[in-house]
């Protein structure tokens, strides 16, 4: 099973933008009900799509949003949670704001599957 990786803003470039596999990034924050609802969905998807896509989680704090402390938040306009983005070859291809069920998420990923 592909392991879901948690990355910091310092690891984002290497783990997301420079990865060979397509990457699904889940931008989340603490205390977010819809973010918590995505955990079992992402776990199931990680197992289902093993070797086809890498799932990465990136925690965003309120300081990142309100005080501009994260280049990622600025670059990709992450302002609501969860925000899901698909990256391939260092380029963001698609984004979604809000939680998705597994089948909806598979449709969202059609651009790289």
Predicted feature locations:
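N-terminal leader/targeting and pre-domain segments
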Residues: 1-23, 104, 108-113
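Thioredoxin-like thiol-disulfide oxidoreductase module
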Residues: 11, 43-113
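Residues that scaffold the ATP/ADP-binding catalytic core of kinase and kinase-like folds
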Residues: 15, 35, 95-96
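Short pre-active-site segment immediately N-terminal to redox-active cysteine/selenocysteine motifs
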Residues: 20, 28-31, 80
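Short, proline-centered helix/strand-breaking motifs
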Residues: 22-24, 40, 82
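Conserved SAM-binding loop
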Residues: 24, 34, 62
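Conserved beta-strand segments of the P-loop GTPase G domain that flank and frequently precede/overlap
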Residues: 25-27, 58-59
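Conserved redox-active cysteine motifs that mediate thiol-disulfide chemistry
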Residues: 27-41
């Amino acid at each position: 099973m592909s392991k879901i990786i948690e990355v910091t803003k310092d690891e984002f470039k290497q783990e997301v933008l420079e990865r060979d596999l397509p990457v699904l990034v889940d931008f989340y924050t603490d205390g977010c009900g819809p973010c918590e609802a995505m955990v079992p969905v992402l776990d199931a998807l990680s197992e289902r799509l093993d070797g086809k896509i890498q799932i990465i989680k990136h925690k965003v704090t309120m300081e990142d949003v309100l005080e501009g402390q994260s280049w990622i938040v600025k670059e990709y306009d992450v302002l609501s949670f969860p925000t899901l983005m698909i990256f391939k070859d260092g380029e963001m291809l698609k984004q979604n704001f809000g939680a998705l069920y597994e089948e909806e998420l598979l449709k969202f990923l059609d651009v790289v599957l």
